[in-house]
Amino acid sequence: RTHLFACGIKRKSIKWICRENSEKITVCVPDRKIQLCVANFLNSRLETMEKFKEIFLISVNTEAKLLYNKNEGKDPSIFCNELRNSFSDFRSSFIGDDMDFGGNTDRVKGYINTKFSDYYKEKNVEKLNNIKKEWWEKNKANLWNHMIVNHKGNISKECAIIPAEEPQINLWIKEWNENFLMEKKRLFLNIKDKCVENKKYEACFGGCRLPCSSYTSFMKKSKTQMEVLTNLYKKKNSGVDKNNFLNDLFKKNNKNDLDDFFKNEKEYDDLCDCR
């Protein structure tokens, strides 16, 4: 029970935090990742490799419990996605290729590196990274099973399969897309509820004003976030096929490109046009 208090109750709002790192590169991070349960690492001396593994198992198990409590068992697909995304982010945090920075993220990264350097009597950074990657490959199945062990009745057999390794930026773009579509739908349903009696060009008045402005602000902020994420993707993928992943994402949403992604639907214009 005490281990749950080492990590806070999950915030339920969908949010992305965009910040500039030390290299002057802006990174947008899902709030889910910012809340990843890594505090137990910092609350332990991690004297031995066995203790490190014990704390890692506790952390993934606690993360799953907190995500389940956040979801309240309402949507298995959302719970599944968050489980799998958090597991992948545990890997990135451990391996050292996490795009998130600051706070516990940097402290945990440095602490784990120090401990693994002690465990293996190795100071060379490249060799140390290879050691961590080998350790992950050896232990990932056990970590994943420990993460889902109490929730196998709440997820599908497909969801229970250990997540395949995929670049963090790809996973975050997919997660952003899922978050975007959910929030867009919620805000648009509010417009339809509040503005159904609205007459053309009068949306800026009465109860229709706030839903329309909230939707507009959300779309503007979301476009900035997606531009940041796609720029990060292109920086990390310089090959000939660098746009394939993004193009597939646009096609999945029946869009042609980034600009098309954020065009207002005709129904929005009909309900919220207040020129």
Enumerate the predicted regions with their spans.
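Intrinsically disordered, low-complexity segments
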Residues: 1-275
